[in-house]
Amino acid sequence: MNKKQLEEIIKDSVVFTIHTKNGFVSEELNRDKINFRKENMLEIVKRHGVYQYISLDDIDVITIMR
């Protein structure tokens, strides 16, 4: 998956979760909680200023909640 594909998938969603190939499932996210870093890295802003980084290549499923 690349940045453009991910943006297209989530553009109309309000809340979504990201599932990776190694079994990680994110908390419920919205577009304000993610940033793109470098060409192939997704930054998830979590609580208390904690960040989590996911390679776009590791994304397996995106579940649109609403």
Residue ranges and their predicted role:
Residues D32-I34, I54-M65:
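Structured surface patches comprising rigid loops and adjacent beta-strands/short helices at the edges
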Residues M1-V25:
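Short glycine-rich, low-complexity segments
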Residues N22-V50:
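Acidic, low-complexity, intrinsically disordered interaction modules
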Residues M1-K4, I62-R66:
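Short acidic DE-rich linear segments
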Residues T17-H19, H48-D57:
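Short linear motifs in low-complexity, proline-biased tails and propeptides
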